[in-house]
A protein has these predicted regions:
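Conserved N-terminal alpha-helix of the aminotransferase class I/II PLP-enzyme fold
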Residues: 38, 43-95, 117-124
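Conserved small-domain helix->loop->beta segment predominantly found in fold-type I
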Residues: 275-278, 282-284, 289, 293, ...
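Conserved PLP-enzyme active-site core in the AAT-like
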Residues: 2-6, 15-17, 21-24, 84-315
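Glycine-rich beta-alpha junction loops
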Residues: 20-22, 35-41, 212, 229-230, ...
């Protein structure tokens, strides 16, 4: 059970009510869209207290907005964290999260089995500003241990990997990270808080591309990070940024003065202030609309994905299916531990005949859409090596488990029988 207003409620209740209440002036039930850039101050002293971080409140919509705040409160409640911060996209949240932990000369250890754009951001863009990322096999715990040194600032993994749906052993990775005084960062985009709450397994920070399953309708871009409030920066020699006075706030020491909220406070007041990747109020409103049906959608999507994966697994023209919910999957036991409600809606498969056969399959589909997004109400398909992971080298593709014939399927809300029929006719084409 989860808690709100001093009472314990279930997940489905929180996904509808957490973070909002009827407007006190108009008594409107729905969340208002506060389409504003700025806010009035009660006095000069009031403004000064806000700017000095001595009092909470709205200053400027680059840093906070009431509509966005409601979204942040809801996600924090669903994830089980002490606070959350929404930004313009999942990529923006990821980039800012790592800049909030690391700087030039520092290192991050990351799974290699992640979204191709994330590999490029970590391995190229962060490298250009002096942050080195060591990519390792997510299932090789010894490799994670061996990659740690005195400059390591974070472990990063996707709860369910993109695109091959490998399931991370979050608990074991968090144990290694914490033994070295390092925070565990988990991307929960493919699971959402309904299927998995990484904080319960030791994650310190949880990242979502809310653009995907949280929003659920392909209408709004947004990213969110939740702070578990569990990582103690105070006195940790790896994090001088949290233990030394910050000159831009007249000597604030985030670990000391902000306590458990040091990370999320610094992320808002420095990263969002300086880099400006704020979430638009309308986008926050649209994501909130999607969250109200989250559990219903994720249950349906997971059930349909399992049905489709089983059908493809038995098809004579299908060479492989990577879906962790299948009893034959190497990750099936982890699904029982980490994903008991369902294994999500994204997986990969390939046909005998290589890339040409996979391309013909995609081009022959009539109902399923050829799109690079995932987490939509509609079922989507793509060829990772040509799209989401096209920036990777052949070696990186191999390390990520992406073959030339691999296609990625993101299952939507349609009748699974209709989706299976469309796949069958395209395979036969």
């Amino acid at each position: 059970m989860l808690e709100i207003k001093g009472k314990n409620y279930g997940f489905d209740t929180l996904m509808v009510h957490a973070g909002t209440q009827p407007d006190p002036d108009t008594h409107a039930v729905a969340l208002p869209i506060y389409q504003t850039t700025a806010y009035t101050f009660d006095s000069v002293d009031h403004a000064a207290r806000l700017f000095e971080l001595k009092e909470a409140g709205n200053i400027y919509s680059r840093m906070s907005d009431p509509t966005v705040d409601a979204l942040e409160r809801r996600i924090a409640a669903l994830d089980g964290g002490i606070g959350a911060l929404a930004m313009s996209s999942g990529h923006a949240v990821m980039f800012n999260t790592f800049l909030n932990l690391a700087g030039a000369g520092d290192e991050i250890v990351s799974s290699i089995c992640i979204y191709g754009g994330a590999i490029n951001m970590l391995g190229v863009t962060l490298d250009r500003i002096g942050i080195k990322v060591r990519f390792v096999d997510p299932d090789d715990l010894d490799a994670w241990e061996a990659a740690v040194n005195d400059r390591t600032k974070a472990f990063f993994v996707e709860g369910i990997g993109n695109p091959n749906a490998n399931v991370a052993d979050i608990g074991s990775l968090a144990d290694i990270a914490h033994r070295h005084g390092i925070p565990m960062v988990v991307d929960s985009t493919f699971t959402t808080p309904y299927l998995q709450r990484p904080i319960e397994y030791g994650a310190d920070f949880v990242i979502h591309s809310a653009t995907k399953f949280l929003g659920g309708h392909g209408t709004a871009m947004c990213g969110i990070v939740t702070d578990a409030g569990t990582f103690d920066f105070s006195g940790n020699p790896r994090f001088p940024l949290y233990n030394e006075p910050d000159v831009s706030y007249h000597g604030v020491v985030f670990a000391k003065d902000c306590g458990k909220a040091g990370f999320i406070t610094r992320l808002r007041t420095m990263m969002l202030r300086d880099l400006g990747a704020c979430c638009a109020p309308l986008n926050a409103f649209l994501i909130m609309q999607g969250i109200e049906t989250l559990s219903l959608r994720m249950r349906r999507i997971s059930d349909s994905a399992l049905e489709i994966a089983r059908h493809l697994k038995a098809h004579p023209d299908v060479a492989f299916v990577n879906y962790p919910g299948l009893e034959s999957s190497r990750y099936y036991d982890r699904v029982q531990r980490y994903l008991p409600k369902g294994a999500g809606g994204v997986f990969t498969f390939g046909l005998h005949g290589g890339r040409e056969r996979g391309a013909r399959l995609i081009d022959s589909l009539e109902l399923i859409m050829h799109v690079t997004n995932v987490g939509d109400a509609r079922t989507l398909i793509s060829h990772p090596a040509s799209t989401t992971h096209s920036q990777l080298s052949d070696e990186q593709l191999a390390e990520s488990g992406i073959r030339p014939e691999t296609v990625r399927l993101s299952v939507g809300l349609e009748d699974p029988a209709a989706l299976i029929a469309d796949l069958d006719q395209a395979i036969a084409a």
